[in-house]
């Protein structure tokens, strides 16, 4: 798989089955990396995933017709925080991780976000060096650590809080 084989586009309601499949895969493969759980989302009807795609910005990376990566974006609510957005739900299938899919997804979501916000924030599990390194290479800076932010199977996970000033890049 090469960089040229990948198409990045916004997912639509019609992509709900593909989105549900990759989202559940992400939650099962890396349960420590997400606030939600496989069991909770697996029990949801397909309409929940379709509605999420209709009301949220979720970008997908496609190799032909296969969805190989996803990332979400949301503008913060509230008048005083409307200049900020959040990158969420990032996942790239293992077979696509060396094809710059993650990089292309983050670049695409930043380009999309730049039209709406000045600052994009994210959180990532401290131990996820590969993701942290990717975000840092793309201009995200650490601004804090949330201790014991997630608890999975009796273990606590700290989150590194990162942000990128889109008005400067």
Locate each region found by the language model:
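Glycine-rich acetyl-CoA-binding "A-motif" of GNAT/NAT acetyltransferases
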Residues: 66-69, 130, 156
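Terminal substrate-recognition subdomain of acyl/acetyltransferases
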Residues: 2-5, 13, 158-169
């Amino acid at each position: 798989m090469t960089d040229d084989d990948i198409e990045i586009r916004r997912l639509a309601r019609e992509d709900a089955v593909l989105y549900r499949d990759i989202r559940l895969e992400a939650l099962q493969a890396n349960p420590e990396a997400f606030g939600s759980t496989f069991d909770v989302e697996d029990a949801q009807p397909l309409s929940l995933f379709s509605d999420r795609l209709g009301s949220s910005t979720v970008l997908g990376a496609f190799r032909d017709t296969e969805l190989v990566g996803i990332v979400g974006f949301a503008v913060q609510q509230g008048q005083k925080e409307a200049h900020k957005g959040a990158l969420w739900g990032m996942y790239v299938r293992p077979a696509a991780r060396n094809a710059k899919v993650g990089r292309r997804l983050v670049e695409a979501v930043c380009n999309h976000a730049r039209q709406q916000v000045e600052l994009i924030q994210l959180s990532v599990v401290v131990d996820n060096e590969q993701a942290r390194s990717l975000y840092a290479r793309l201009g995200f800076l650490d601004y804090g650590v949330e201790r014991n932010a997630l608890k999975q199977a009796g273990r606590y996970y700290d989150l590194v809080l990162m942000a990128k000033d889109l008005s400067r890049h």
